[in-house]
UniProtKB/Swiss-Prot annotation:
Its main location: membrane. The gene is nuoB. NDH-1 is composed of 14 different subunits. Subunits NuoB, C, D, E, F, and G constitute the peripheral sector of the complex. [4Fe-4S] cluster binds at residues 37-38, 102, 132. It is found in: Cell inner membrane. This is NADH-quinone oxidoreductase subunit B. One of its GO terms (molecular function) is 4 iron, 4 sulfur cluster binding. The lineage of its organism: Bacteria, Pseudomonadati, Pseudomonadota, Betaproteobacteria, Burkholderiales.
Length: 158
């Protein structure tokens, strides 16, 4: 029995929810799952011009240390089980950002036999960033949209 069983929905729980969600938005640690050319723009977002660190984000190499997965690029059928495996290794709470036309719906390779038509068929996606490839500004906007979504979540009072 956790804190959600003790506290009923009210002022205290909503204040605690606000505090917890604020801390989650300020410390997203993304794991890069770069599969194609969109990964270059993802790296560009981490460089000095856009500096993704100012949002409290630090790219992590391990799924156990990250809470955000950025899927960037064409997802092939052979790579889909690896994507699911990495997603399952991430700790809760976890979020997925799909970056680019290929990750969103297959892109130019939509009709190919070897391409998964969207990574949302393998893992649940929270935010879609359109473009081919999307710019670093679009990725940052998608991250801001994800932070707004996290702020609206109910952590304790479900």
């Amino acid at each position: 029995m956790g804190i959600e069983g003790v506290l009923k929905e009210g002022f205290v729980t909503t204040s605690v929810d606000t505090l917890i969600n604020w801390s989650k938005t300020g410390s997203l640690w993304p794991m890069t799952f770069g599969l194609a050319c969109c990964a270059v723009e993802m790296m560009h977002a981490g460089a000095s011009r856009y500096d993704i660190d100012r949002f409290g984000m630090l790219f992590r190499p391990s799924p156990r240390q990250s809470d955000l997965m950025i899927v960037a690029g064409t997802l092939c059928n052979k790579m889909a089980p690896a994507l699911r495996k990495v997603y399952d290794q991430m700790a809760e709470p976890r979020w997925v950002l799909s970056m680019g036309s290929c990750a969103n719906g297959g892109g130019y390779y939509h009709y190919s036999y070897s391409v998964v038509r969207g990574c949302d068929r393998v893992v649940p996606v929270d935010v879609y960033v359109p473009g081919c490839p999307p710019t670093a500004e679009a990725l940052l906007y998608g991250i801001l949209q994800l932070q707004a979504k996290i702020r609206r979540e109910n952590t304790i009072a479900r």
